[in-house]
Amino acid sequence: MTKSELVEKLAARFPQLLLRDADISVKTILDAMSEALADGHRIEIRGFGSFGLNKRPPRVGRNPKSGERVLVPEKRVPHFKAGKELRERVDRTVTQGGGMNGNGHAPHGKTGQSQLGSQSPASLHDDGQLNLVRS
């Protein structure tokens, strides 16, 4: 789901909201979340999950062009941990045979193929058996 799809869903769910107002609402929420993470805070949305930061320690890397050793500084990266309710809902959807294709992604169209037309590398049968497709 893209941000614009989320805006459209919000506007459809609340008809009193203009599309412009739904867009402003979504942007405001995302900006607040981004700012909180940038300030080093943790975000918890009960039933959905939490956003936090993981620290990556400094390390020595290599410049791929020259092969020269380069010091890569410490950095913080955003991390999402799904909450129990979200994990259970996703698992229930997968085990009931709907909503996901075999590679762990939601299908893009009615055929279950991605927008590029590639076929899923695996499929899950109703009996729980996994079928891997080799190319």
UniProtKB/Swiss-Prot annotation:
Stated name of the protein: Integration host factor subunit beta
Job of this protein: This protein is one of the two subunits of integration host factor, a specific DNA-binding protein that functions in genetic recombination as well as in transcriptional and translational control.
Biased composition (Polar residues): 111-122
A GO term, aspect molecular function: structural constituent of chromatin
Biological processes annotated in GO: DNA recombination; regulation of DNA-templated transcription; regulation of translation
Compositional bias annotation for Basic and acidic residues: 83-92
CDD domains associated with the record: IHF_B
Keywords (A to Z) from UniProt: DNA recombination, DNA-binding, Transcription, Transcription regulation, Translation regulation
Designated gene of the protein: ihfB
Signal sequence, start to end: none
Gene Ontology CC terms: chromosome; cytosol
InterPro entries xrefs: Hist_DNA-bd, IHF-like_DNA-bd_dom_sf, IHF_beta
Pfam families for this protein: Bac_DNA_binding
NCBIfam families: hip, PRK00199.1
Subunit structure: Heterodimer of an alpha and a beta chain.
Keyword NADP: no
HAMAP family: IHF_beta
Similarity comment text for this entry: Belongs to the bacterial histone-like protein family.
Chain intervals for the UniProt region annotation (Disordered): 83-135
